[in-house]
């Protein structure tokens, strides 16, 4: 998920 990385940097996968 890349969109989620924008709002949640904890998910880098």
UniProtKB/Swiss-Prot annotation:
Top-level taxon in the UniProt lineage: Bacteria
Other observations noted: On the 2D-gel the determined pI of this unknown protein is: 5.8, its MW is: 42.7 kDa.
Full protein name: Unknown protein CP 12 from 2D-PAGE
Lineage: Bacteria, Bacillati, Bacillota, Clostridia, Eubacteriales
């Amino acid at each position: 998920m890349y969109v989620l990385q924008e709002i949640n940097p904890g998910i880098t996968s």
